[in-house]
Amino acid sequence: MTDLPALLVAAPIFGSVTVLLAGLLRERTGWPLTVLASLVQVGGAVALAAQAFGDEPVRYVVGGFTAPFGIELVVDGLSATMVVLIAVVSLGVLGYARAAGPRSNVFYATYLLLVAGLTGMSITSDVFNMYVFLEITGLAAYALVASGEGGESALAALKYLLVGTVGASLFLLGIGYAYIGTGTLNMTDLSGQLATLGYTTPLVQASFGLLVAGLFVKIAVFPVHTWQPDAYANAPDSVSAFISALVSTVAAYALARIVFSVFTVEFLLANAFAQSVLVAGAVVSIVFGSVLAVTQTELKRMLAYSSVSQFGLVVGAIAVANGTALTGAMIHLVGHAIMKGGLFLTCGLVATETGARTVEEYDGLVERFPLGAGAFAVLAFAMVGVPPAVGFVGKWYVALGAVEAAAAALAVVVLV
């Protein structure tokens, strides 16, 4: 048994505390310590992924208390991909933050705390432990959004806090219902207990509904997306890039884990209505997110609404629950994280160089800042799914999966 899973959660937490304490002695310690912690995170993530892509998942039992009574961390190929994505993206955005800000020790400490929360959500095999990391992620994200200058950032963070608290509370209630019916929190054990209890039992159905509703808020699926446009638009550019790339991405990954590792495909087969609601929610999110995106004048707000649409696609893939669609969902999750983070970073660079932040102000950008215009164009085309970009590949597999599942409405909105 390797200690790497635990170290990948503990290292950024330790780094966060170290940054705060070192800052009491010397002001400019936050940057080098955060870079060091991030490099350790990347190295550990790559090493763990190399093991996880072997024959069996990597498992770590916290405190020596074996599952189902103790907390188990499990890293398979899917969660290893998420861990590497989190580590690499966070290091990349950190480099931009050094130039564009914020640069305070509190910012760096909170940044590392968010990395810890996202990593923990990705590798835990305990639903209550997932809730704990969900809360850590939320609190760190709220603080980072509020780190911008001016009252708009604080107001956006407050809105994010209020809506996010509702989502976390729904998720916790869902855990409570599951625990009442089964007496366990370990995902593997819980899956078996739920099957024994019966997938059509009202308690099991209520637990599923609450867990999914809570994660819908965190993912920002329409119409519970209201926190996202303000948060992305008013946060510092580096924070917008960081949270847009990873926060909803990891929440969508958590949804996939809850649906397939805890409730399983058999639950969806036994509850056709629940599956239909998931598909309908995905279709609505794709359509309304796209419509709202094209009506925006501010670039960052447009990109935020684009995320509402893009994650509707991922939710739809999870809902149809076949291998083709899920392959597309995972490709799209990784691709979206890189593309959307890159788009927000490009918006920040363009604003720094030219002051342009609206669609109208981007007119003639190719003459004023050709590098920024080129980068934005390439990333935007990839995002909308122009072949052969990764955005096209993910959408194509999701559409094929929707056709296989006879989900015609989903297939149409994905392809259109």
Write out the residue ranges for each language-model feature:
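Alpha-helical multi-pass transmembrane bundles of energy-transducing inner-membrane proteins
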Residues: 22, 26-29, 103-113, 117-200, ...
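Specific lipid-exposed transmembrane alpha-helices and their immediate membrane-water interface residues
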Residues: 6, 10, 50-54, 59-61, ...
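Membrane-interface helix termini and inter-helical loops of multi-pass transporters
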Residues: 54-72, 183-198, 258-271, 327-328, ...
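Interfacial segments of multi-pass membrane proteins
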Residues: 144, 232, 315-324, 394-411
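Short helix-boundary/re-entrant hairpin motifs in multi-pass inner-membrane proteins
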Residues: 64, 209-277, 304
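Transmembrane helix-loop-helix hairpins at membrane boundaries of multipass inner-membrane proteins
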Residues: 2-109
